[in-house]
Each structure stands twice: as structure tokens, then as C-alpha cells.
Amino acid sequence: MKKLAAVMLTSCLMVAVGASFADEMKKDDMKKDVMMKKDDMAKDEMKKDSMAKDGMKKDAMKKDAMMKKDGMTKDEMKK
């Protein structure tokens, strides 16, 4: 009878330890998911910032092209 009680006790403890370990792993996975989401959000913000810079580049290119055209018309007027 003592052996049966000892086996039951050890098996219950093994199940409890396994469940505890599984919970810890689940919490760890949740932490990793949260960190990955934060990292993705940071990357999205970087993309938005680079898109704004692209807009500035395009605007500068337009101004540069307009100034070149203006310079050409002034040269034509001189002739």
C-alpha cells in the first residue's frame, strides 16, 4: 500500500511540475510575441519616416527642375 501511495504522490508531482513548466513556456512565448510586435511597430515608424523623407526629396527635385527651367528661359532671353 505504501508503494502505491508513493507512486501516486510522485506521479501527481510530475504532472504538477509538467504543468508549471508548460505555463512558464507559455508566458515566455507571450513575452516574445509582445517584443516582436513592438519591434514591428518600430520598423513601421521607420518606414513612415523614410516615406516623409522621400516626399522631401521629390519636392527638392521639383524645385531643382523648376530652377533649371527658369535658368534656361533667362539664357534664352539674353540671346
Curated annotation (Swiss-Prot):
Which keywords accompany this UniProt record? Oxidation, Periplasm, Signal, Stress response
- Organism equals Azospira oryzae (strain ATCC BAA-33 / DSM 13638 / PS) (Dechlorosoma suillum)
Residues making up the signal peptide according to the UniProt record? 1-22
Sequence segments annotated as region (Disordered): 37-79
What InterPro entries does its record include? Penta_MxKDx
Q: What is this protein called?
A: Methionine-rich peptide X
- Function noted in UniProt: Serves as an oxidative stress sink, specifically for chlorite and hypochlorite.
Q: GO cellular component terms?
A: periplasmic space
What is the deletion mutant like?
A: Growth somewhat inhibited by chlorite.
Subcellular localization, as worded in the UniProt entry: Periplasm
**Induction text:** Part of the SigF regulon, induced by chlorite under positive control of SigF. Part of the probable yedZ1-yedY1-mrpX operon. Transcript levels are 20- to 60-fold increased when induced by chlorite or hypochlorite or in the absence of anti-sigma factor NrsF. Not induced by hydrogen peroxide.
The record describes its post-translational modification as: Protein is oxidized (possibly on Met residues) when cells are exposed to chlorite or hypochlorite; initially the protein is highly oxidized, by 50 minutes all protein is in the reduced form.
